[in-house]
């Protein structure tokens, strides 16, 4: 059971020491409590709740009130956990809007907020940092931009796009981001970015060389019998119970057993 409160300093220390970071999404108190007890290092209250909780076909309809409610639920269940909350679609289109939404999520129990996007977020991230709000950046596949991207596709496969993603990662780190999620990029790009950043990188479909891994809880529990993303694994089938599934996930991320090349993109 997690008895010591995790902080961003904990995650930064893990990167320096080469200890892999395990993280999962959660949306309620019971699952947040259980996964924290089984060694998961931090929790993301993801706007993926639009898909897996609300049954929508994207994250776009998720509201700030939705995120506040689920962040409060997660915090009640996991008082010592490091909790990151997603900022919903079009709630950080200006720095001033971002400050208000981020403050509400922090007051709901988040330790950090996550924003999707690249260079255009530099001013916003600088402003959030100045105001004492820690930021997790998110590059690669951006679910909130799925309509622009034309679907859920691997990003950064072409050299120019890969170089641009790296440059954006460096700019966001310089602006003050303290964590970076990389989603659905080639494993080689995940490794390249991780080696050049001083902040921890958390991959989802970004290969085994990022500083940590994150999965949507429903994916790693195999809850969608019709579809399992390439980058996911059904840990419940292997573990046999929810507690063992979370424990196995944390252990296999830590040991490097997960993810394998099978779960990665070229």
UniProtKB/Swiss-Prot annotation:
Pfam families given in the database record: Pantoate_transf
Record key words, sorted: Cytoplasm, Magnesium, Metal-binding, Pantothenate biosynthesis, Transferase
Domain of life: Bacteria
Enzyme Commission number(s): 2.1.2.11
Residues holding 3-methyl-2-oxobutanoate: 47-48, 86, 114
Record-annotated active site: 183
Subcellular location(s) per record: Cytoplasm
Cofactor: Mg(2+)
Binding site for Mg(2+): 47, 86, 116
Pathway in which the depicted protein is active: Cofactor biosynthesis; (R)-pantothenate biosynthesis; (R)-pantoate from 3-methyl-2-oxobutanoate: step 1/2
GO biological process terms, semicolon-separated: pantothenate biosynthetic process
Cofactor note as given: Binds 1 Mg(2+) ion per subunit.
Subunit composition and interactions: Homodecamer; pentamer of dimers.
NCBIfam families referenced in this protein's UniProt entry, alphabetically: panB (TIGR00222), PRK00311.1 (NF001452)
PANTHER family reported for this sequence: 3-METHYL-2-OXOBUTANOATE HYDROXYMETHYLTRANSFERASE (PTHR20881:SF0)
Task of the protein: Catalyzes the reversible reaction in which hydroxymethyl group from 5,10-methylenetetrahydrofolate is transferred onto alpha-ketoisovalerate to form ketopantoate.
Name of the protein in its database record: 3-methyl-2-oxobutanoate hydroxymethyltransferase
